[in-house]
Amino acid sequence: MDSFFVEGARVWLRDKEQLLPATVSSCSHDDGTLVLTADYGEVVYVQQSELNRDKVFAMHPSSILGVEDMSSLGELHEAAIMHNLNLRYQKDNIYTNIGSILAAVNPYKLISGLYSPAVVDQYSKHHLGELPPHIFAVANECYRCLWKRHDSQCVLISGESGAGKTESTKLLLQFLSVMSQNSGGTPPSEKTTRVEQAIIQSSPIMEAFGNAKTVYNNNSSRFGKFIQLHFSQSGNIQGGCITDYLLEKNRVVRQNPGERNYHIFYSLLAGADRDLREFYFLSAGPGAYHYLSQSGCVKDSSLDDQHLYTSVMRWGQAFETRT
């Protein structure tokens, strides 16, 4: 236990049923008191005579410095995993590997250059593990394995509401689209280019009809989706299919307080011109409709309903939709 009694030493402090990362603030040999400061602000005073390894134990160097792949952590428990994710998050390193699994922490902000064309190009030229963890590394490995293994590949994206599943899906599709356009062999035909554009640009339409504001997430997907991409032998995207399931149909007629119906209804009222509103006998605002206003929330400062309407109308042309 002597190694713990050094100011600045990093330790794990057990608090009830959880472990807290902490630092030894001071150690008085006169009265035998050890002062520990948890990373979350709590200060704990412990008598050295009462110390045991169940209460306080040294933090492994890998947990102190942080690692890119958590399978290499010297101590593998829930607290070490969460602490490592937090260490990287504080440095804007939102991606961390756990073996072949990629953990992503939503930064709730834009990180400059993280998804730039230069980064796409960089990850397209390296194998998994050669560069820092990134969703582009997963997408590239998936694309390469199509040809290495001559078999279909699958990427599963899961997480709680607001974790970033929708954005992660967009980024995967973005990377695969670039790889398709840059693939060798015959240059992509005009038809193939339209297919790529339709798949990439499907997100605004899917979000408009399937996403809604909830108390936890202003752009929450209220459905799941299964996306299939079909590649030619030369590596081009030649087709695709998006299947939705478990749509929250009851939201159309009832929403919890502070939530909204699906985005499309509000964007239609915000973006449609007078002629279109008159044609469909629409009122000027969502407040006139019980199904849109019963929750007490019809607008949100973070949502641009008019812009979404414009996006849906523009990107709907990529599908060559008919009305």
Region locations from a protein language model:
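Short coil-to-beta transition motif at edge beta-strands of beta-rich domains
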Residues: 2-14
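N-terminal switch/interaction subdomains of large nucleotide-dependent motors and GTPases
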Residues: 4-6, 21-31, 36-323
